[in-house]
Amino acid sequence: MKWVVSIFLIVLLNFTESRTMHENAYGIASILDSSQCSAEMNLVDLATIFFAQFVQEATYKEVNQMVKDVLTVIEKSTGSEQPAGCLENQVSVFLEEICHEEEIPEKYGLSHCCSQSGEERHNCFLARKKAAPASIPPFQVPEPVTSCKAYEENRELFMTRYIYEIARRHPFLYAPTILSLAAQYDKIIPPCCKAENAVECFQTKAASITKELRESSLLNQHMCTVMRQFGARTFRAITVTKLSQKFPKANFTEIQKLVLDVAHIHEECCRGNVLECLQDAERVVSYVCSQQDTLSSKIAECCKLPTTLELGQCIIHAENDDKPEGLSPNLNRFLGERDFNQLSSREKDLSMARFTYEYSRRHPKLAVPVILRVAKGYQELLEKCSQSENPLECQDKGEEELEKYIQESQALAKRSCGLFQKLGEYYLQNAFLVAYTKKAPQLTPPELMALTRKMATTGAACCHLSEDRQLACGEGAADLIIGQLCIRHEEMPINPGVGQCCTSSYANRRPCFSSLVLDETYVPPPFSDDKFIFHKDLCQAQGVALQTMKQQFLINLVKQKPQITEEQLEAVIADFSGLLEKCCQGQEQEVCFAEEGPALISKTRASLGV
């Protein structure tokens, strides 16, 4: 079984271009050649991934049958002269296999998609993908005795079944990434099956795979959503930023060449074209190593590794290369005497791409969204100064103001870490909980708790880093968390404020949410006593269970009075804590809550005017 890594591609975000053109808008040639195809393709695994991701509810038996059927079709189509990996219109062939099955379309609600053709059919299937379908339970690794026996009896079948289980639960996860994770799992099984404590061995060694699986799945979905929602120009800027930070010695033309090809790979991976996604991933990783002398001095040891899997992982974790000597510290008067407003659209895009490249290679520790905000601010500055009496003087003054984007992000990181140091992770989450219940009161309590728990956990992790790394850590994590919130809004609209922040500007999404205070359109529901009834289980609960109960009370309180002030909130919390202390110390806890609880709520309603 051939395993190929693609995590390297996760780092190299990109913009969408058609591969058949083999050059981007600036005439830069592609390193990918669509006339080439790989004979070394494990089509069983790739077809399994495709069908499991596009028909998530299908059983393994059903997926296995579709795999067998489509391989027969492919062999007939390509003949003996060409490898199966050369099949054209691969996605169409795979989708046709789903639709021509007698029971599959009707059983799984696919008839509407199957009634369409071409791109419409493909887009219909893509829109059906669900990140966490309720009908599919979380994956549980079988207990060691069963796993080890099944693995020993038929390793290929065991691993294909594992790939099926992962793919159907993570429909946005790139095919090469699934194969990479399966390769890691394949390696831990033999030693763990021989271990004295097999259960502990599997739990310990599978933990890192599970973590990488979860993070990669979220990241792949995030990238595909950004590509779809914000388009080519934004994705190009993201890619140029990341590549320029990773390879600061590479010239602009080389960066643009990589942008084009990594872009195509992401496009194919996001659209579920598993064969081309995998083939092109190999080529880009190989190309990076072939150009290591001009790209980076940090990947030499990586490129000596024997397998693509090891090579790719090594490059991912390699440090950003050192900045070239003689690089000027700033980009004053970057355009020189040229009038920005007189440039064509193509020239403007090229100028901004080059500015982003130059700025990124000078600031390897800044988060991508921060650099994009600087670039956006710089373009606005150029447009404004082109209309002034003294454009160059205007630029000189304005370029100093670009630091405000970095300073705003630094101030937020400092403020958040200050809160963490003062309050700890739980109370930091409560602060986020109050803020985001006001911003998005339409979210359910479990959604609000899950969202803010991620924020608090991220804050704790980032704040333990050195000060120069806190900013990139926090901004990067916030981008992903907000991205998940925006996916939720796309599926089920939350409110106009959230919608505005999610769709207006990728670079400014986080600042937009930071400045969003209240949903002015929200009307609190009529007061319900049922949401504020206290029982003795508050005294019996401990740890996470008790914290969850308290947070539920906090959410209900803020939803009832979104305009609640910090002073009012502190007073209510103090009264609530007093109630717990009084009733939990007594013998008749339930009686105490029944008597004192309503009194507390009456006092709270009077003070808040609800």
Swiss-Prot record:
One GO term describing the cellular component: cytoplasm
One annotated GO molecular function: metal ion binding
GO biological process terms, semicolon-separated: apoptotic process; homeostasis of number of cells; immune response; ovulation from ovarian follicle; progesterone metabolic process
Main location: secreted
Keyword list, A-Z: Copper, Disulfide bond, Glycoprotein, Metal-binding, Nickel, Phosphoprotein, Repeat, Secreted, Signal, Sulfation
Residues annotated as domain Albumin: 19-210, 211-403, 404-602
Sites where the protein binds Cu(2+): H22
Tissue: Plasma. Synthesized by the fetal liver and yolk sac.
Domain of life: Eukaryota
Subcellular location: Secreted
Modified residues (Phosphoserine): S111, S115, S117, S345
Glycosylation sites: N251
Leader sequence residues: 1-18
Family the UniProt entry places it in: Belongs to the ALB/AFP/VDB family.
Subunit details: Dimeric and trimeric forms have been found in addition to the monomeric form.
Function: Binds copper, nickel, and fatty acids as well as, and bilirubin less well than, serum albumin.
Name recorded for this polypeptide: Alpha-fetoprotein
Organism: Sus scrofa
Species classification: Eukaryota, Metazoa, Chordata, Craniata, Vertebrata
Underlying gene: AFP
